[in-house]
């Protein structure tokens, strides 16, 4: 096992359109689930996995996100926060990482969405991704979950996982058993040749997967995608039962 990344990129620049009206006056990152902002749920998971620095991209209500993160640091809470400013233009997942390359350093990093919450059944899920990471074999390692153990993700799945951990993205019309649940490790330089401006990671992942360079791990637990107000209520109900 290689050393777990100490730096994470936290993707917090989205408009949160599907979360309206909760995002009429705040970004999705600051929507609270069970009394805690979504971004804090994710930052605390990353800190538990020994992440020391989080590079957070901001766009929609950027000032509110920055103020929240400064207040968090003022309380002495880890991790150290570095802002990647996308106020001029939101750059999506791939473009956001490319824009932040100078802030992310040389090694692999965690990349995390802020709208994924989970209840772990056996061990720490982020640690499981770190344990599976092997930079000789892979450029990306995805955290995955069974469609039967996830709420609010794609019912027809995203990927198949081979016995040796290789990811294959489903073809049109296929039903896959696993979904991507919002956390991965990657070599951030995979985005360097992407276009200037916004672009998604997904086409890049698919090209790398075709070359056998994308792996995955499916820890045990219940994963919840908090993408709209109804999903927020469902997540809070599940957390209350845990």
From Swiss-Prot:
Source lineage: Bacteria, Pseudomonadati, Pseudomonadota, Alphaproteobacteria, Caulobacterales
Enzyme kind, highest EC tier: transferase
CDD domains tied to this protein: NTP_transferase_like_1
Residue sites binding UTP per the record: 16-18, 28
Pathway noted in the entry: Cell wall biogenesis; peptidoglycan recycling
Signal peptide per UniProt: none
The keyword Cell wall biogenesis/degradation appears for this protein: yes
Name listed for the protein in its UniProt record: N-acetylmuramate alpha-1-phosphate uridylyltransferase
Complex and partners: Monomer.
PANTHER family with a match to the protein in the record: N-ACETYLMURAMATE ALPHA-1-PHOSPHATE URIDYLYLTRANSFERASE, NUCLEOTIDYL TRANSFERASE
Membrane spanning residue stretches: none
InterPro entries referenced in this protein's UniProt entry, alphabetically: GlmU-like (IPR050065), MobA-like_NTP_Trfase (IPR025877), MurNAcPUrMurU (IPR054913), Nucleotide-diphossugar_trans (IPR029044)
Entry's EC annotation: 2.7.7.99
Family per similarity comment: Belongs to the nucleotidyltransferase MurU family.
């Amino acid at each position: 096992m290689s050393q777990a990344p100490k730096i994470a990129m936290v993707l917090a620049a989205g408009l949160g359109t599907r979360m309206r009206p909760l995002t009429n006056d705040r970004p999705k990152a600051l929507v609270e689930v069970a009394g805690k902002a979504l971004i804090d749920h994710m930052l605390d998971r990353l800190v538990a996995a020994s992440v020391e620095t989080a590079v957070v991209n901001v766009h929609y209500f950027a000032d509110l996100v920055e103020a929240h993160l400064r207040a968090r640091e003022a309380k002495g809470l880890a991790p150290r926060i570095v802002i990647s400013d996308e106020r001029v233009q939101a750059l999506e997942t791939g473009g956001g990482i490319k824009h932040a390359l100078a802030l992310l350093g040389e090694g692999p990093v965690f990349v995390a969405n802020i709208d994924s919450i989970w209840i772990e059944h056996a061990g720490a899920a982020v640690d499981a991704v770190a344990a599976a990471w092997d930079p000789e074999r892979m450029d990306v390692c995805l955290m995955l979950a069974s469609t039967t153990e996830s709420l609010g993700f794609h019912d027809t799945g995203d990927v198949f996982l081979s016995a040796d951990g290789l990811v294959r993205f489903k073809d049109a019309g296929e039903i896959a058993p696993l979904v991507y649940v919002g956390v991965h490790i990657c070599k951030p330089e995979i985005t360097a040749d992407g276009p200037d401006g916004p672009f998604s990671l997904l086409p890049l992942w698919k090209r790398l997967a075709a070359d056998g360079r994308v792996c995955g791990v499916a820890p045990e637990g219940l994963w919840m995608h908090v993408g709209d107000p109804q999903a927020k209520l469902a997540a809070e109900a599940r957390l209350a039962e845990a």
